[in-house]
């Protein structure tokens, strides 16, 4: 019993160690191929983008499937309630099923975005693989609307979404749990930093 418990504890420790290690290996780059060399600079770059759009009162949209959808929905709430930003959900059941039924699942984001996204808005696309067709279509629509795009991806370094954003955050790991946890953690850190700038005391 004690031996099994010890093995479990070691595995948990190793998993946490891997998560922290990958967190500090996160790569943030822009279209001009410039890269942030430290975690702190990467976070500051992302924070500056969100703060700029908050000041402009831009609309903010999050895209994601599965676990990334859960993160997107969570951040839609947090960036509005705690960050004071104009977030809009793309996850209304009636709209999602309508778009999926009438146009196909690959268009569940891009079709409503054609009506909702305006020039100068901010779109955050979250995808562990960076290759989900509906996410790629959503990013493409955001680009046509001249919205600013941030991508959060993982797995392969040459995934499609990573090539399409104005700012691209990449987690060099093939595990869904690690990639999704880091995406969520970084976005939550951005919310907390916005709150601190607004004078909120923790």
Language model region names:
Residues 1-202:
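Conserved N-terminal alpha-helical segment that immediately precedes and caps sugar-phosphate-binding
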């Amino acid at each position: 019993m004690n031996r099994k418990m010890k093995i479990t504890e070691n595995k948990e420790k190793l998993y946490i160690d891997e998560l922290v290690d990958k967190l500090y290996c996160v790569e943030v780059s822009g279209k001009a191929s410039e890269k942030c060399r430290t975690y702190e600079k990467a976070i500051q770059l992302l924070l500056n983008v969100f703060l700029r759009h908050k000041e402009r009162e831009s609309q903010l949209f999050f895209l994601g499937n599965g676990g990334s959808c859960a993160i997107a929905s969570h951040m839609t709430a947090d960036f509005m309630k705690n960050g004071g930003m104009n977030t809009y959900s793309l996850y209304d059941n009636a709209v999602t099923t309508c778009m999926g039924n009438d146009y196909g699942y690959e268009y569940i984001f891009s079709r409503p975005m054609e009506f909702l996204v305006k020039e100068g808005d901010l779109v955050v696309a979250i995808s562990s693989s960076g290759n989900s067709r509906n996410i790629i279509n959503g990013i493409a629509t955001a680009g046509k609307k001249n919205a600013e795009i941030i991508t959060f991806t993982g797995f392969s370094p040459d995934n499609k979404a990573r090539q399409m954003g104005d700012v691209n955050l990449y987690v060099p790991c093939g595990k869904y749990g690690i990639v999704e946890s880091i995406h969520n953690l970084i976005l939550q850190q951005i919310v907390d930093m916005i709150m601190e700038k607004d004078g909120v005391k923790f």
